[in-house]
């Protein structure tokens, strides 16, 4: 019997963890067939996937983490919104819904800058990006769009883990497409 190699196991686990983005893949693949410049003016949208919220009330904080796939460029950004919590009752405190949080771009060939704003009371997410399409470095596009996130707190959906400061609670957030509006081309 052949013994599995660590690299193959890691690759298998990595690929298995990518099940979430594949649910949105048919639409994304069809749109990727069009050029970046066409999509930049017609559908400057984002696919938000693999999002989750993690609360650590006992330690006084939490965060929402998500991945934003930019449709025109096909580039992926990782975004985190950190917030403070009251250690006694777990309420979110001092959160500025207008604060912009820079995302980390897993850049390939485009110049993509993405940021998010998140209103923790309504879970309204606003995404903003500016980018240049490969092969057309003369035009810089900018777009913004908003969508409400849906946090799943149904029984069994969230993971509760004990820590030194009390329980941490991690809940999934449903995938969503954010329809972008082109703000300008310079």
Predicted regions and their residues:
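Mature, structured extracellular domains of secreted fungal proteins
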Residues: 22-186
